[in-house]
UniProtKB/Swiss-Prot annotation:
Species annotation: Oryza sativa subsp. japonica
Coiled-coil region list: none
Functional note: Auxin response factors (ARFs) are transcriptional factors that bind specifically to the DNA sequence 5'-TGTCTC-3' found in the auxin-responsive promoter elements (AuxREs).
Pfam families associated with the record: ARF_AD, B3
DNA bind region: 125-227
GO terms of molecular function: DNA binding
Gene Ontology cellular component list: nucleus
Keyword vocabulary terms for this entry: Auxin signaling pathway, DNA-binding, Nucleus, Transcription, Transcription regulation
Domain note: Interactions between auxin response factors (ARFs) and Aux/IAA proteins occur through their C-terminal dimerization domains III and IV.
Protein name: Auxin response factor 10
Compartment list: Nucleus
GO-annotated biological processes: auxin-activated signaling pathway; regulation of DNA-templated transcription
DNA-binding in keyword set: yes
Assembly description: Homodimers and heterodimers.
Length: 699
């Protein structure tokens, strides 16, 4: 096992000796953490490159998205010129078969940390310098808390109360300040000795100064440099000065901000030489020990993350709509605030270079976007899940839906369930590097095993969160449950593998076979359909031509038309917001269908709905997904109103004036206009209107 002695000799960029760990932690901030020796971590080269001072080209090294490593040494240091603290971490990649878990040293470190947490922590205080504090020749206004808890106690009996305060910086240099209590109203000030300190450290307004008192009563002083030109978008922060609390939260975006102008890649803004990043990534790829420099005050999260935290975060099947909260600290680390957000997307931040990387996997939106306007992407292990259910935007009088029942077939979605994908199941990744482990938590399938021609079409991975949902793969009874009628297998002519059903509103897909009951068009005089003609696609009422159809154009220069006329095909009945789309065949047509519950030119007849007599669908006016209701089990309108009241939590009196249906003749009626027995026979689609004066059934 490597020890600190192997790192004793300072190397280029070290900036001198080690820094007291407590002072280092006070300067780094309460949210910064460094894994202890012996801890199992995942090293993210993508995150390491974000701390580089220039762009890093890692394409030649074939660097994986993450490398399992063990921490063998940690050294806390500070820059010789700026006093900015950083850590040098030595890592050893784990070999195949090694468990990615902490070893005894890390467990002992955790025990020591718990013991230290039980003891009183050293008192520290940070203040962001104002223009007056940073003025050359001026003084420093000491907050009362700092003066009374960190500085030695003043003798208030003297006039004025005054004393000398000695503090050591991160390099061990001692500074002496004159502490006086004066003014109207009276306040604590550092006068003599402050100006030389400002000049030596080159302090400016926006920088923060940290005072800490250790257990022995010694006072230490450290610095936090402001991140200039960072919080604003294409300008200064003056445009945001009117936002309440902006000065306090000016640094909230420091550790997690991303730029969108570079296609999701965070532009380099760190202090690590790019050659150091390339060397570390290359050695990690080849399984050799390597060192990294970590700046806790940089604009990016930690890139050496505890393995347990990554596994826990990636065990969640993230999808858009999930609610989460995330902790941020103010620039002076005076407090930590939690901000609520919503997952807007789940996609690799750099799908070309690292298509499988979970680094900054989540695209997010915030409830308070003014304060977090640059935080567009976050890592899953930095957020805390609040709700795994996406937000449902329902009418004001309509409550959330009741808990759905499990369908009889696992291959199909729940009735009324909306596909919010992409939802990524665990996918193991096999990598050719000898040290690379299988990562069951990686969010995307491994593209290295795909043919070269498929790798260029990775976007097809996101077409549907159910990749096995093929017409040809489902049994006829499963398709009947979905509302799609297929011909018997013994009557269907052999056909190539049908295209995948893409879940999209108003998307109609050509038939893969030739069912006898639809092989002859009514308007074509019984002529058989030409099998050789390519299938056509109808999207939002417009014909979508394939490349083959464009090449095989008509003699007059027009492309060959699809197998049906989109503009002339009428609906077979009055529309419905839920059901199977059965395009009316015209000349040279093939039967077509679309998935239920996703709109389209729908029909309301019981046979087309695949509903038994006495059954119907119930909709709320603003919804496109209906719920099944068995009217034959009811005996009166009162029971109907009571059932719907329990189903939607709407008062029975309100339902009497808001419930309408369409008769077989196409007439819109209110419930109660005809006897209940006649209503049961004719009603196939009920709709609860948000406006009692509306007769809109959504057709």
């Amino acid at each position: 096992m490597l020890t600190f002695m192997e790192l004793a000799g300072p190397t280029e960029g070290d900036g001198g000796g080690s820094v007291d760990s407590q002072l280092w932690a006070a300067c780094a901030g309460s949210m910064s953490s460094v894994p202890p020796v012996g801890a199992a971590v995942y090293y993210f080269p993508q995150g390491h490159a974000e701390q580089a001072s220039a762009a890093v080209d890692l394409s030649s090294a074939r660097v994986p998205p993450l490398v399992p490593c063990r921490v063998v040494a940690v050294r806390f240091m500070a820059d010789a010129e700026s006093d900015e603290v950083f850590a040098k971490i030595r890592l050893v990649p784990l070999r195949p078969g090694d468990a990615v878990v902490d070893v005894g040293e890390a467990a002992a470190a955790e025990a020591r940390r718990e013991e230290e947490n039980s003891r009183p922590r050293p008192t520290s205080f940070a203040k962001t310098l104002t223009q007056s504090d940073a003025n050359n020749g001026g003084g420093f206004s000491v907050p009362r808390f700092c003066a009374e808890t960190i500085f030695p106690e003043l003798d208030y009996s003297s006039e004025p109360p005054v004393q000398s305060v000695c503090a050591k910086d991160v390099h061990g240099v001692e500074w002496t300040f004159r502490h006086i209590y004066r003014g109207t109203p009276r306040r604590h000030l550092l006068t003599t000795g402050w100006s030389p300190f400002v000049n030596k450290k080159q302090l400016t307004a926006g920088d923060s100064i940290v005072f800490m008192r250790d257990e022995g009563g010694n006072i230490h002083v450290g610095l936090r440099r402001a991140k200039r030109g960072f919080c604003s978008i294409g300008g200064d922060d003056e445009s945001l000065s009117s936002i309440p609390g902006w000065d306090q939260y000016r640094g909230l975006m420091r550790r997690n901000a991303t730029a969108t102008a570079t296609g999701g890649r965070t532009p380099p803004k760190g202090k690590v030489p790019p050659e150091n990043v390339l060397t570390a990534a290359t050695r990690a790829t080849t399984g050799q020990p390597f060192e990294v420099l970590y700046y806790p005050r940089a604009s990016t999260p930690e890139f050496c993350v505890r393995a347990a935290a990554v596994r826990t975060a990636m065990a969640v099947q993230w999808c858009p709509g999930m609610r989460f909260k995330m902790a941020f600290e103010t620039e002076d680390s005076s407090r930590i605030s939690w901000f609520m957000g919503t997952v807007a997307g789940v996609q690799a931040s750099d799908p070309v270079r690292w298509p499988q990387s979970p680094w900054r996997l989540l695209q997010v939106t915030w409830d308070e976007p003014e304060l977090l306007q640059n935080v567009k992407r976050v890592c899953p292990w930095l957020v805390e899940l609040v709700s795994s259910m996406p937000n449902l935007h329902l009418p004001s009088f309509s409550p959330p839906r009741k808990k759905p029942r499990n369908p009889p077939y696992a291959e199909l979605p729940l009735e009324g369930q909306i596909f919010t994908g992409p939802v990524f199941p665990p996918n193991p990744m096999a990598h050719d590097h000898h040290h690379h482990h299988g990562f069951p938590f990686l969010p995307f399938p491994d593209s290295s095993a795909q043919p070269a021609g498929i790798q260029g079409a990775r976007h097809a991975q996101f077409a549907s969160p159910f990749p096995e949902f093929h017409i040809g793969n489902l049994q006829p009874n499963l398709m009947l449950y979905a509302g799609i009628r297929l011909p018997p297998a013994d009557r269907a002519a052999p056909a190539p593998r049908p295209p995948r059903i893409i879940i999209s509103t108003d998307l109609t897909i050509g038939s893969p076979g030739k069912p006898d009951d639809a092989a002859c068009s009514p308007s074509s005089g019984g002529k058989k359909i030409d099998d050789t003609k390519p299938r056509g696609f109808l999207l939002f009422g417009q014909a979508i031509l394939t490349e083959e159809q464009i090449k095989n154009g008509n003699s007059d220069g027009r492309p060959a038309s699809p197998n049906w006329d989109a503009e002339k095909a009428p609906n077979t009945s009055e529309g419905s917001d839920s059901g199977v789309t059965q395009g009316s065949p015209t000349k040279n047509t093939t039967p077509s269908w679309s998935l239920p519950y996703f709109g389209g030119n729908n029909i309301s007849r019981a046979s087309e709905y695949e509903l038994n007599p006495g059954q119907c669908k119930v909709f709320v006016e603003s919804e496109t997904v209906g719920r099944s209701l068995d009217l034959s089990a009811l005996s009166s309108f009162e029971e109907l109103y009571a059932c719907l009241s329990d189903m939607f939590s709407i008062g029975s009196d309100e339902l009497r004036s808001h419930l309408v249906y369409r008769s077989p003749a196409g007439e819109v009626k209110h419930a109660g206009d005809e006897p209940f027995c006649a209503f049961v026979k004719s009603a196939r689609k009920l709709r609860i209107l948000t406006d009692a004066g509306s007769d809109n059934l959504g057709d």
